[in-house]
Amino acid sequence: MAQELGCRMGQVEQMIRYAYWNSKSQGIVVGVSGGVDSALAAAFCCRAIGPEKVLGLSLPASVSNPQDLSDAQELCAMLGMEHRVVLIDPMLAAFKTIPGFVETPYLLGNLMARIRMTVLYYHANRDHRLVCGTSNRSEAMLGYCTKYGDNAADFQPIVHLYKTDVYEMAKEVKIPKAILEKTPSAGLWAGQSDEGEIGLSYAEIDAALKNLEANGWKAGTPSEEKVLSRAQANAHKRLAAPNLLSVP
């Protein structure tokens, strides 16, 4: 079991090295939120190309839990990677001056995710780095992400891993206990949690996804019906934009 896990981790690190070398970039930038997904992605990057080439960016807003920033700082110190903090409230305030601006949790959450993506790519462009994605398979299959926001990246090291697999690997690379034990949250508004918003635990989501994939995407339980409905509604997030471009 340990050998199999080591092989799977080695494959991820090799993919990161390939993306890095092939791009001729000078490093990697990863948004470190204080959550387990970004923690594991950052750890993989440090293991693959060395922590001195990896920049961790925390992009909190006033609604963010202060403990998340503290956990992100601890993670970066443990991994030996550089850490910077950019508060996104001034950018949010600028958007709120747009005539007709409407503020709802849904609209503001998507806006925050896209602002964070823009800041990550600004630093990547400035420092000749790649942006590392932090989406896992469970989120990707459900479409639990912001299009052109937190799903935007130059490579995705953990998108093939179910959330339950993420926890398994995070324990293996010694991610801090505070990160492993916290409630998963996108941090888009105070008190928000992934499982509360979706209405299922990640254990239930992953079990449903595995059963659906094994049974030709035919739901057999209420949980599977809920997961399938969400996956179908958000299929556009997993696909390229429709187009008529033909490349020989």
From Swiss-Prot:
Mg(2+) binds at residues 37, 139. Pfam families: NAD_synthase. Coiled coil: none annotated. GO terms for molecular function: ATP binding; glutaminase activity; metal ion binding; NAD+ synthase (glutamine-hydrolyzing) activity; NAD+ synthase activity. Pathway: Cofactor biosynthesis; NAD(+) biosynthesis; NAD(+) from deamido-NAD(+) (ammonia route): step 1/1. One of its GO terms (biological process) is NAD biosynthetic process. Its EC number is 6.3.1.5. ATP binds at residues 31-38, 134, 163, 185. Deamido-NAD(+) binds at residues 114, 147, 154, 236-237. It catalyses: deamido-NAD(+) + NH4(+) + ATP = AMP + diphosphate + NAD(+) + H(+). Keywords: ATP-binding, Ligase, Magnesium, Metal-binding, NAD, Nucleotide-binding. One of its GO terms (cellular component) is cytoplasm. Catalyzes the ATP-dependent amidation of deamido-NAD to form NAD. Uses ammonia as a nitrogen source. NCBIfam families: nadE, PRK13980.1. Homodimer. Belongs to the NAD synthetase family. This is NH(3)-dependent NAD(+) synthetase. It comes from Methanoregula boonei (strain DSM 21154 / JCM 14090 / 6A8). The gene is nadE.
